[in-house]
């Protein structure tokens, strides 16, 4: 859903893509925080994927922040270690696919989190399209 207008994103907008070699450094990965709930063997990584300016311009986006909460049983990996592994798998999927768009990034995250140590992935996205 477009967070500015409240309208649903159409299938055409969600599947709109650009070749990955046309946009240098298309994604910015940021770990927001790491939670270690007390008395559990889980670790929660809050990860944000941001589309860079050139990718947003190519896809007619005003803002695109994809927020993920990854619940894992991997308590050995620090935040930066997990983020590097996560980023590598997402970019590997996208480079093999050859195109990058909103739905393709979400599919790449599903590929990166399809591991035995990942319990749950929660998504909360902030996407705004250009009016003009």
UniProtKB/Swiss-Prot annotation:
UniProtKB keywords: Host-virus interaction
GO BP field: viral process
Keyword Amino-acid biosynthesis: no
Entry keyword annotation includes Ligase: no
Record's signal peptide: none
Cysteine disulfide partners in this protein: none
Function field: Increases viral DNA accumulation. Enhances infectivity and symptom expression.
Record family assignment: Belongs to the geminiviridae replication enhancer protein family.
Quaternary structure and partners: Homooligomer. Interacts with the replication-associated protein (REP). Interacts with host proliferating cell nuclear antigen (PCNA). Interacts with host retinoblastoma-related protein 1 (RBR1), and may thereby deregulate the host cell cycle. Oligomerization and interaction with PCNA are necessary for optimal replication enhancement.
Name recorded for this polypeptide: Replication enhancer protein
Organism field: Bean golden yellow mosaic virus (isolate Puerto Rico)
């Amino acid at each position: 859903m477009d967070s500015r207008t409240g309208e649903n994103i159409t299938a055409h907008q969600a599947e709109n893509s650009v070749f990955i070699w046309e946009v240098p450094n298309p994604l910015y990965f940021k770990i927001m925080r790491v939670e270690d709930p007390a008395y559990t063997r889980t670790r929660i990584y809050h990860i944000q994927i941001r589309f860079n300016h050139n990718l947003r311009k190519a896809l007619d986006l005003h803002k695109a922040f994809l927020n993920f909460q990854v619940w894992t049983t991997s308590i050995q990996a620090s935040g930066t270690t997990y983020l590097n592994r996560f980023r590598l798998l997402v970019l590997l999927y996208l480079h093999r696919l050859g195109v990058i768009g909103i739905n393709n990034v979400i599919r790449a995250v599903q590929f990166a989190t399809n591991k035995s140590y990942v319990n749950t992935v929660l998504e909360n996205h902030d996407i705004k399209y250009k009016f003009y």
